[in-house]
Amino acid sequence: MPGISASASRIKKWEMEEYDQYQHYFYDDHNLDEDFFKSTAPSEDIWKKFELVPTPPMSPVRILEGSGPSPGDRLEWVSQFLGQDDEQEGLCKLNAEETLENLSSIIIQDCMWSSFSASQQLEKVVSERLSCSAQSKLSGKAQCVPADVPALNSLATDCVDPAAVLTFPLSSSCKKQVSSGSESRTDSSDDEEIDVVTVEHKQNKSRLVNARKPVTITVRADPHDPCMKRFHISIHQQQHNYAARSPDSYPEEEPPRKKIRQEIVQPRLASTPQTPERKSPLPSPSVPAQSPTVSASPTHTSYHLKSQPSSPQSSDCEDTDKRKTHNFLERKRRNDLRSRFLALRDEIPGLVDCPKTPKVVILTKATEYLRTLHVSDRQKAQEKKQLKSKQQQLLRRLAELKRA
């Protein structure tokens, strides 16, 4: 046919031009020195790693001129198309006339060219051929071509039998059963609800407030597609309160001191009213019977006797008061010590004009100064004795002079 041959030649010419234009990006025979700065492709080393080849030809143009080939030629073309992957790995070497005229084949209508599942169309064709085998030869339209094309009256009146071409079962061709740790999908029905995430609550009944609520989301890829899948997604719908405790964390343990006090107070509340014998310093034999947890050691018993008139709240208040008193006394002691060091520094002659003298230096200088003071004290004591003796001599001489 002149129209088909002209279109096929144009397609082949366009493919060869595209092949020549991008061939130096993928092969080693291109001179990089000549076209180094003109090329916008990545470095050649990257393409060597992937070993890329030219892309396959585009979808064949459906020219509606002429009539389709005979069923025998169509079957031969389909077998050649299916066996091509095992023989070749490069460009598709198909006859352009057969490719353009074979519009009634189900292979050309598969998901690679028309974006829908080929297995569904094959099932449809097989079911229609089994039910309408007598009427299929008289129909003027192919079953695999959309019905909104008005110019398909001159096409072939019969489709290729998929059972004669495809040997694998049609019902399970494109359906897979995917199952992971938290995902399960089956092909029993299109409207089946698939539980994607399953959360098992192993916590107490008091934590059911923080439970995760499943949300059903309907996803529809095509508005005209009757298939619909529902997914259960577990969403944690709790507000983020960063001050609150985590729902998965266990309650914090109280300090051991408070535990002991609680164990001591609980038997005391459950026991009978106290008797005056409890005031004695020695533990009575009734005390261990009333509080078995405290009877382990005598120290616990004495502690129990001392802590009876106070509750945990009052004991906490007493601890706070003791801590405050201790801090006040410690602060006062430090202030007194600092003031005394300053007074000692002022007494040393060499450190009066040194306000930032360390305490060690103050103590060393004070020791040396104290030793000098002791030496001077001894000297002055000796001088005092000498002066007293001299005074005694002078008084005796004066008395002798008066007698004379």
From Swiss-Prot:
Chain spans, region Disordered: 175-195, 238-331
PROSITE patterns associated with the record: BHLH
Gene Ontology CC terms, in alphabetical order: nucleus
Domain of life of the native organism: Eukaryota
A GO term, aspect molecular function: DNA-binding transcription factor activity, RNA polymerase II-specific
This protein's UniProt keywords: DNA-binding, Nucleus
Matching Pfam families: HLH, Myc_N
SMART domains xref list: HLH
Protein name per Swiss-Prot or TrEMBL: Protein L-Myc-1b
Encoding gene (name): mycl1b
